[in-house]
Amino acid sequence: MSDERLAERPADEADEQRPPVRPLDSVDRDILRLLRADGRASVRSVADQVHVSRANAYARINRLLEDGVIRGFSARIDQERAGHGTSAYITLKIVQDSWRSVRERLRELPGAAHMALVGGDFDVLLLVHTKDNRSLRDLVLTRIQAIPEVLSTRTLLVFEETDLDPEP
């Protein structure tokens, strides 16, 4: 979003502070699709592609930011070229009702890229990127397994990653 300053939203607002969900129309969905493909697209470019005025596109993008639909803008990174030759999904079983404290500890980990509380055979799915296998081993054995609420872990090495393109 290079040509205007858009609303900034704290990365981690509490759920009770979030505005109610507003329905998205086809123009909103088109804007999201375009920004997902190119988060650096200018408001003017977005407006032209969805056939609305620049002011309308600006207002819509700002609303999507304020409502928390757009959580931010980021770059897609080739982890290997960035010096992270090893990626892994780590599954964790944790003590019941400890998600919030475990989440805060996992956020501090170097290379943690994504985490989710899930249902099934394990409780947490964590994606990490590390320099090499030794760094991954150290991360799992000395950092993650040292968290008192973590009961067990299982590490799944990633052999190849593919970013999915936005829907047409």
Where does each model-flagged region fall?
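A compositional/biophysical signature of low hydrophobicity enriched in polar/charged and small residues
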Residues: M1-P168
